[in-house]
């Protein structure tokens, strides 16, 4: 009986995961650009973006955490990358409380507490390919 309940619970989580990821991408990219201004002290995105205190974020959606060439990630972020991909749901969780999700992350920012702000900034970041160009252009 326990295994059946566990299997049912796991199945429900797996079915909900794409929906969670989609919800995180329903944000407003224009509003996300404004939210991202508070991230710009450490991060850059767009054409010509370069690493700063934190890594540049072009093409972050779909990237394995801790793998951007040219940036020195914490051992904790590199370990987190084993088995994770930056998708909307993972970014949403991380941006809410970075140090709770990746204990030992170099990111000092405490997190974006508001769901809508996280959805907006994720929608904004999702617009950029690896070269900082708007996707689809």
Regions of interest found by a model, annotated:
Residues 29-33, 47-86, 106-111:
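Gly/Gly-Pro-rich "capping" loops immediately C-terminal to redox-active cysteine motifs
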Residues 7-17:
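Bacterial N-terminal signal peptides
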Residues 19-36, 47-48, 136:
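Electrostatic cytochrome c docking/interface patches
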Residues 37-39, 55, 89:
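Structural detector for helix-capping/boundary residues
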Residues 85-136:
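C-terminal capping alpha-helices of c-type cytochrome domains
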Residues 32, 36-45, 121, 125:
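The canonical Cys-X-X-Cys-His
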Residues 1-6:
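Positively charged n-region of N-terminal signal peptides that target proteins for export
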Residues 15, 44, 62, 96, ...:
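Residues at helix-coil transition
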């Amino acid at each position: 009986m326990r295994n059946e309940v566990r299997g049912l619970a796991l199945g429900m989580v797996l079915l909900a995961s794409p929906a969670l990821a989609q919800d995180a991408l329903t944000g407003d990219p224009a509003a996300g650009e404004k939210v991202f201004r508070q991230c710009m002290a450490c991060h850059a995105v767009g054409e010509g973006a370069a690493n700063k205190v934190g890594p540049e974020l072009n093409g972050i959606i779909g990237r394995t955490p801790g793998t951007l060439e040219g940036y020195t990630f914490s051992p904790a972020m590199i370990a987190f990358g084993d088995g994770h991909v930056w998708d909307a749901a993972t970014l949403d969780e991380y941006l809410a409380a970075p140090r709770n999700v990746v204990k030992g992350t170099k990111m000092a920012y405490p997190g974006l507490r508001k769901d809508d702000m996280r959805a907006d900034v994720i929608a904004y970041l999702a617009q950029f390919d690896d070269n900082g160009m708007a996707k689809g252009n």
